[in-house]
């Protein structure tokens, strides 16, 4: 199990990223638009830099829903390889069977 503080910190980052997503996207669009004047683009880039660091989606780490483990994460199942193996062998994941050949 991951530290509870690390999992909670990641949840706060997710919430902050959602809260600022629209504002961040709008400012990024202005910065990348070549038709907008250079001065306005510069103002937008400064405003973008003034946003909280944790409001960027890049700062959010994918974590296992079961254990909170940050590594060996399967996006499709939203869990780590270890939790997948345990739950799969117990038969809690539909369609997952032990392989034999």
Curated annotation (Swiss-Prot):
It holds the Pfam family Ribosomal_S14. SUPFAM superfamilies: Glucocorticoid receptor-like (DNA-binding domain). Keywords: Ribonucleoprotein, Ribosomal protein, RNA-binding, rRNA-binding. Coiled coil: none annotated. One of its GO terms (biological process) is translation. PANTHER family: 30S RIBOSOMAL PROTEIN S14, SMALL RIBOSOMAL SUBUNIT PROTEIN US14M. HAMAP family: Ribosomal_uS14_1. This is Small ribosomal subunit protein uS14. It comes from Bartonella bacilliformis (strain ATCC 35685 / KC583 / Herrer 020/F12,63). The lineage of its organism: Bacteria, Pseudomonadati, Pseudomonadota, Alphaproteobacteria, Hyphomicrobiales. The gene is rpsN.
